[in-house]
């Protein structure tokens, strides 16, 4: 895998076969040109959206590479890129959301398999969550490398199925929402668990419960099944997306529902959500008839 690859176009989908024989340096130069062009166009679209505020205007849609066919959670880095992953392999990919370019990928030792559903970053640690509540902790690495990891079992796997994980920096804790209750009696609520860092003390875990009627609001949903959760960088509220309902809710850390609405645009299977520090909403869709994509919108608080 080359350190930088474009994810919208195939490398050899070029006017001539000679282009496929370019040197790595020439290909890198071409990618830099594409990146510059896309950033310029994105800036133009942002300016146009800001000239007509009021709606979450679509800014760009990037097709993801085959290894992200089942793209899942999203986690923003301090440098403005985003970490994401496929939900069947313990491999992390870094993408520039402003250009749709895949920068690198690395994995946990042994190419771990499993139902990995969410990702977050806390300091220098990366966390991957399995649907059974087990959390894998490891470090960022260079392209193609494998890194050691540790595993923490939250003990919540018998109670819930999970697909969301976020780092709440103000409280130094991990936040995860129950997607589906596994007991026979569904409590009809949105339940959000919070685990203080460092992990290890189950007794320190807390949760908030939000009645499902408040979550649904005026929407025609019958329930709400969280597929990812992230923190709004501006007001620190929880932004929770649900693939089945194709909508999202904004909830305060105290459990108050601020808003509940359908996602903008056309989303076949939205699995990840994040908000950048410059007010761009990112939504990832895994392949479902159409290829996997990362869509950008102007975020409207």
Predicted regions and their residues:
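Bacterial N-terminal signal peptides that target proteins for export
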Residues: 1-7
